[in-house]
Amino acid sequence: MTTLEAFAKARSEGRAALIPYLTAGFPSREGFLQAVEEVLPYADLLEIGLPYSDPLGDGPVIQRASELALRKGMSVQGALELVREVRALTEKPLFLMTYLNPVLAWGPERFFGLFKQAGATGVILPDLPPDEDPGLVRLAQEIGLETVFLLAPTSTDARIATVVRHATGFVYAVSVTGVTGMRERLPEEVKDLVRRIKARTALPVAVGFGVSGKATAAQAAVADGVVVGSALVRALEEGRSLAPLLQEIRQGLQRLEANPGLKESSKKPLS
């Protein structure tokens, strides 16, 4: 299943796509795979976070998960193996969220090539402004990975135009200025951010940061998709089942009226 097909399927069902985030190797290798099996029936796409020692864009919940996964021996090689195992479980799009440092440490061509071979659909690069290293972005795309970048409510229209020009797959709209984490309510600015992004690209737009339940999911459902991370990781941290939370969030993603249809994107890797 392609990324556009996954978003289109959700839209045909009158809802935003659900994109669960899980940290590779948390709460353990086996626990991670169990969590994947629990979220897959609800997920349209899946985001897997590569644990990193200095996750500047992540809040305390995901920071703790990364620290524990690293202490238990999770590594880039371990994440590769997990992506391969997850790919054997599903045909749904799988996106690897990674900071730039591990990519550079392994060498971009090797890193991207191995994750593509393992079954990743694309990479989310939260700390890479794509116009600062278009060659690296182009390399990922030529290897066959979709490239996803973040935009915030503070992003200017000019900045949005620059970022979406380098993006493939979908565009990640950050609901708040700050780090990941659960919130009781999302700021109203998220609607305007989604509108401004969609005015400049045919790619799907997914909202992340702060979605923790039905109410915040409903707010975020102005977008084509919604990423849920900290709330799921917190549930794993506390030893709770993920199904009740996923059911609640799916209810919030249901729309009374479907958003305007996704246009078939003709975007190709940068040349």
Swiss-Prot record:
CDD domains given for it? Answer: Tryptophan_synthase_alpha
Catalytic reaction list: (1S,2R)-1-C-(indol-3-yl)glycerol 3-phosphate + L-serine = D-glyceraldehyde 3-phosphate + L-tryptophan + H2O
Q: Which domain of life is it from?
A: Bacteria
Known pathway: Amino-acid biosynthesis; L-tryptophan biosynthesis; L-tryptophan from chorismate: step 5/5
Active site at which residues? 47 (proton acceptor), 58 (proton acceptor)
Entry's HAMAP family?
A: Trp_synth_alpha
Q: Which family does it belong to?
A: Belongs to the TrpA family.
Instruction: Provide the assembly information.
Output: Tetramer of two alpha and two beta chains.
Q: What does this protein do?
A: The alpha subunit is responsible for the aldol cleavage of indoleglycerol phosphate to indole and glyceraldehyde 3-phosphate.
Question: What's the protein here called?
Answer: Tryptophan synthase alpha chain
The uppermost taxa in this organism's lineage are: Bacteria, Thermotogati, Deinococcota, Deinococci, Thermales
The gene from which this protein is expressed is trpA
